């Protein structure tokens, strides 16, 4: 019998790539999305596919469907988007988690939570392992996202302990690739769009802060392996690329790869912006035998090709 997967936020950057893979594996997929940051164009190639069902739905309201598994990806994930309506952002993480966990409890569905490396705050150790408790600011301008995701993790583990809900909690690190929103303010999409348009490349701070960037195909591989793992591992589990690089180096790399004449300009660093972000993926390696395969240059090439076509 065909398995039914619910993907909240399924028209977004990560969600749409996940939907592709679930349909390829033969599952019937229900996408629930309010299209605040997602786009139907990310699913346009599947619109005639009978395995796909799309519904406009905000997970702040309960959803009554029969499903075998739930992938909870719904939430604005870039500072520009999540700071636009911070109250709605934290509600989506918390109330949305309660509604999806309630659905999982009722239908006996396995449920995946797309948590984030932001739960570690501005880390004082690097790389960050899952047992690092973080260096966080619960009242800062980023807290609507960071603290919402932390609260969602609490809810997931309490539903597991109290109600036996079968959970998977992944802490997702910086991810990039085709279908990123061109105006979402994330480092790689910003730099590529600015380079292709010949605009100045904007770096916040002096560019010495580091990130580790995982190509979207690698990330989805890790998510699928985690959901299906036969060791019943619940998480939390870091999924990301452990290769660290400075923001300035990324900007220079993209300028070179696009052949752009763009110059770098520096602006003040926003409040609570982490200086380091790098995952310890030992747990994913040991339990899932997973590690990223696509290096940054290869992934950037694919992403630049996508944005060239998008901006043409």
Where is each model-derived feature located?
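Residue-level signal for the nucleotide or nucleotide-sugar donor/cofactor binding architecture
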Residues: 38, 84, 92-95, 143, ...
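N-terminal Rossmann-like NAD(P)+-binding domain of SDR-like oxidoreductases, especially those catalyzing
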Residues: 1-175, 217-220, 290, 302, ...
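Conserved C-terminal active-site "lid" loop/helix of NAD(P)H-dependent oxidoreductases
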Residues: 216, 236, 268-292, 302
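Glycine/proline-rich active-site loop of Rossmann-fold NAD(P)-dependent oxidoreductases
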Residues: 124, 150, 165-166, 175-190, ...
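Hydrophobic pocket-lining residues that define ligand/cofactor binding sites across diverse proteins
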Residues: 104, 160, 195, 203, ...
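A short C-terminal helix-loop "cap" of Rossmann-like NAD(P)-dependent dehydrogenase/epimerase domains
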Residues: 50-52, 130-136, 164-166, 192-203, ...
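PAPS/PAP-binding and catalytic site of the sulfotransferase fold
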Residues: 246-258, 299-303
């Amino acid at each position: 019998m065909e398995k039914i997967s619910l993907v909240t936020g399924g028209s977004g950057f990560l969600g749409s790539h996940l939907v592709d893979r679930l349909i390829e594996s033969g599952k019937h997929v229900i996408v629930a999305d309010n299209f605040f940051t997602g786009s139907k164009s990310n699913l346009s190639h599947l619109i005639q596919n009978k395995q796909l069902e799309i519904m406009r739905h905000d997970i702040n309201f309960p959803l009554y469907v029969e499903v075998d598994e739930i992938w909870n990806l719904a939430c604005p994930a870039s500072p520009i988007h999540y700071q636009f309506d911070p109250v709605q952002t934290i509600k989506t993480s918390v109330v949305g988690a309660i509604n999806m966990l309630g659905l999982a409890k009722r239908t006996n569905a396995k449920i995946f939570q797309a948590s984030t490396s932001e739960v570690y705050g501005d880390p004082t150790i690097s790389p960050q392992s899952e047992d690092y408790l973080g260096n966080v600011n619960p009242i800062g301008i980023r807290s609507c996202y960071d603290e919402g995701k932390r609260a969602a993790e609490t809810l997931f583990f309490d539903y597991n302990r109290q109600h036996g809900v079968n959970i998977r909690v992944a802490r997702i690190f910086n991810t990039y690739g085709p279908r990123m929103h061109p105006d979402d303010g994330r480092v790689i999409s910003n730099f590529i769009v600015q380079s292709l348009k010949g605009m100045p490349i904007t770096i916040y701070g002096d560019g010495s802060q580091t990130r580790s960037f995982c190509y979207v195909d690698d990330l989805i591989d890790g998510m699928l392996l985690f959901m299906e793992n036969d060791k019943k591992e619940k998480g939390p589990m870091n999924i990301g690329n452990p290769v660290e690089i400075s923001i300035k180096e990324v900007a220079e790399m993209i300028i070179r790869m696009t052949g752009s004449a763009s110059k770098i300009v520096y602006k003040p660093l926003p409040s609570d912006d982490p200086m380091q972000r790098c995952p310890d993926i030992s747990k994913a390696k040991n339990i899932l035998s997973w590690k990223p395969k696509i290096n940054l240059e290869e992934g950037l090439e694919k992403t630049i090709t996508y944005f060239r076509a998008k901006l043409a």
